[in-house]
A protein has these predicted regions:
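Arg/Lys-rich, intrinsically disordered low-complexity tails that mediate electrostatic binding
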Residues: 1-37
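Domain-length cofactor-binding catalytic modules of enzymes
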Residues: 350, 357-361
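N-terminal mature-domain region immediately after signal-peptide cleavage
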Residues: 23-33, 38-294, 301-307, 312-346, ...
């Protein structure tokens, strides 16, 4: 007799009432209210202002007004993701948020906590749900070290079954390697170019471009253009790409009223962690209160958890200096942020690249995995030692990381002195595979199409045709940064659409994902 799986309590409350509904075609980022920013571009624009709680309430209400089912659907997708990746439902992760993150945020970041409470009130959610949205990127890092925090006198009874399961996995090398591959896949995201100076950019100013890639399950929610205007005296305004309920960017592309642009790419295979301040709060405080690049680097390192470890890149457009033209020149900074090892570089004339690894050998070799299988190395760029490059795929062009590093270096050198936003758009839509020696839109290329890769390459967790790929592009230059704006494109950088229906026809092994996926049609550019 078949037993019906008990639906998680959170899903019974918040999931779409017709959970087992017949498959209908969704468009990634679509909203029932049609608040997508005009022109069918699928961006949802919201502006919030004032005191923390009030702007949070406004945030929640605006999302619900645009699409009453947005959070319901979002949590149902998250529940599916958690069950696929961890074998645990969303209620388990709500519990982790309440036990391990709520207290830290409430005590250390009271204004951010008030904003989260406001979002919950405006959207009729629980605070732990808003916290989960914002620590979503931190959870794979925390979970990899879960036993350290739950196998304690305080939590041993509550988490007894979980401790039993995790000890069994830890004692089984094959199970542990499989778990590591799944968690590492969640850490392999994004390509980034940031350049400045007369030797590199067309006008000597800053140019920045970033594309996100992920599984197409959680990617579909990263369509919010969020503008925050704090009350007077409480920092600077900012505009960012974000998600419903986000207090920070999550995909991490933002511009602030201090004339600073920021972005990042994750460090794949990163395995060091200490439960301190979550990245969502640290980077949000950078954005709101940071006035210089040095302040950003300092705030990121304060009580750093190693969660969502990234190569962060920031650009400061500098001062105009009045009519005499004297002022601070534009500069860019790269912060390769490990846990115990951090590499900070600045330049007034150079280029920084992001490809999910680091140039810092200490982080690559000491704080990143180097013991996974060769297949996992090709899949996530987090595998075996690669001929002197460290355990991150740094020199391995058969991996996503290695190919993108080589190709980004080639392309920025090719366009040296001519880099502008149009050139960066071209770079981020590149399909050249150095391993194959030809154009081939696949899991290795800068414009990532892992869903089209039968080899199960980079970013697909080693599984062929997994619905994973690049799904957006954002670009900015000094002029747009001064306007506190950027250009944004929703969908794969090259413009190739992704159709759920067509993918399922070709690859029915993914049909259980169909209900939770969305189409990414070809779209145009908008100014944020």
């Amino acid at each position: 007799m078949k037993t019906r799986r008990k639906m998680p309590r959170s899903s019974r409350i918040y999931r779409h009432k017709n959970t087992q509904r017949k498959r209908t075609t969704r468009t990634a980022g679509s909203t029932a209210g049609g608040g997508g920013g005009g022109g069918g571009t699928e961006w949802l624009r919201i502006t919030i202002r004032g005191a923390p709680y009030e702007r949070g309430v406004s945030h929640g209400k605006q999302i619900i007004a645009a699409d009453p089912e947005r959070f319901t659907y979002m949590f149902s997708v998250y529940d599916f993701l958690f069950r696929q990746g961890y074998g645990r439902d969303i209620d388990f992760f709500y519990g982790l948020c309440e036990d391990f993150y709520l207290g830290i945020i409430k005590k250390r970041f009271p204004k951010i906590f008030k904003e989260m409470k406001g979002i919950a009130a405006g959207a009729k959610l629980r605070v732990c749900q808003v916290i989960l949205i914002n620590v979503f990127m931190s959870l794979p890092y925390f979970y990899a070290h879960l036993l350290r925090y739950i196998d304690t006198p305080k939590y041993r009874k509550k988490y007894a079954d979980v401790i039993r399961d995790e000890l069994a996995i830890a004692a089984n090398p094959a199970a542990l390697a499989a778990r590591s591959r799944r968690l590492d896949e969640m850490k392999d995201r994004c390509s980034l170019v940031m350049a400045v100076g007369e030797d590199w950019t067309k006008d000597g100013g800053i140019v920045c471009g970033h594309s996100s890639f992920s599984n197409f399950l959680d990617a579909q929610f990263c369509n919010v253009i969020l503008r925050i205007e704090p009350e007077a005296g409480d920092g600077v305004p900012m505009v960012m790409q974000s998600v419903p309920g986000g207090i920070y960017s999550m995909t991490d592309f933002f511009v602030t009223g201090a004339g600073i642009v920021g972005s990042e790419t994750t460090i794949s295979g990163f395995n060091a962690f200490a439960l301190r301040d979550p990245i969502c709060c640290r980077i949000r405080e950078c954005m709101q209160y940071g006035r210089t690049l040095e302040e950003y680097a300092e705030r990121l390192q304060k009580r750093n958890s190693g969660d969502y470890a990234c190569s962060w890149m920031f650009g400061d457009v500098g001062g105009h200096g009045g009519h005499g033209g004297h002022g601070r020149p534009p500069r860019i900074m790269r912060v390769e942020l490990g846990l115990n090892y951090v590499n900070v570089e600045t330049t007034k004339n150079g280029v920084f690249l992001g490809f999910n690894s680091t140039y810092d050998e200490r982080i690559r070799n000491i704080e990143c995995s180097s013991s996974l299988s060769e297949k996992a190395n090709h899949a996530t760029g987090a595998g075996a030692i690669d001929g002197g490059g460290g355990g991150s795929g740094f020199r391995d062009v058969s991996s996503s990381i290695g190919n993108r590093r080589v190709q980004l270096e080639k392309l920025t050198e090719k366009y040296r002195g001519r880099i502008d936003t149009d050139v960066v758009k071209r770079i981020l839509s590149d399909h050249y595979d150095n391993h194959l020696g030809k154009m081939a839109a696949n899991s290795r290329t800068v414009c990532k199409h892992a869903y089209a890769d039968g080899g199960g390459g980079g970013g697909g967790g080693g599984v062929p045709f997994k619905p994973v790929g690049a799904y957006d592009t954002k670009v900015a230059d000094s002029a747009s940064i001064r306007r506190m704006s950027f250009l944004a494109h929703w969908g794969p950088p090259c413009g190739t659409p992704f159709s759920v229906r067509e993918h399922m026809k070709k690859h029915p092994e993914w049909k259980d994902w169909a209900e939770y996926l969305a189409d990414f049609p070809k779209r145009g550019w908008v100014e944020a």
